Amino acid sequence: MTNKEDSTQKQYQDSPIGYELALLLKIANEPGMLGKVTTIIGKFKSNIYTVDTVDVTHEYTLREFRISTSDQEEAHKLSTELDKHDGVEVVHASDITFQMHRQGKIEISNKVPVNNHADLSHVYTPGVGRVCMAIHENKDAVYSLTHKANTIAVVTDGTAVLGLGDIGPEAAMPVMEGKAMLFKSFANIDAWPICLDTKDTEEIISIVKAIAPGFGGILLEDISAPRCFEIEERLKKELD
């Protein structure tokens, strides 16, 4: 790993946003208890972003705190210290970044509802057959009769992911999902991660050419140099 990559990796590891916590605390409903909790949080040099009251009874107040800490170890120490304090119970603690990634950050959704048999006959068989034949007779019709015109394949082999280096296709998926989210959020373009379990240049080129009919564009993402340049140039020449 180069000095630049090592510096970038440390930047990601040390970022306070990477250790933003959601803490659900059950606090005794007594005067001064909220102040005691915030004082404990302050001792750990943590910032409180928000405090939301979830429930109130005569005995306790249930509050959700959104907090940033310096690192993961400090977050664990803070949670442990709060739980030891009389009148405070940590009901749940979660890393907000990980919470956002549970079950993935993107999904495929239908643009047309399928509520009954008639709808099904239009979007699938038998009606879809006529659409297939229209594209068979005129391949350019695929851009107006399918999702292709608005779809991008985000292709990686996981060899040069951000400042993390060669971490493999599975570990690259969260970044590729994030890239797909940017396409959707800022341009309303549907993008999907294609994470390849190969580092072979010829195999990557072959795979991308094989999947190209299903996408309007191909984004080569986080493939290590110098292979990335050869792959890009070859695909520019060999794809339309």
Residue ranges and their predicted role:
Residues 2-102:
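A conserved regulatory-domain signal marking ACT and ACT-like small-molecule sensing domains
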Residues 60-63, 75, 79, 89-239:
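Metallocofactor- and cofactor-centric catalytic cores in central/energy metabolism, strongly enriched
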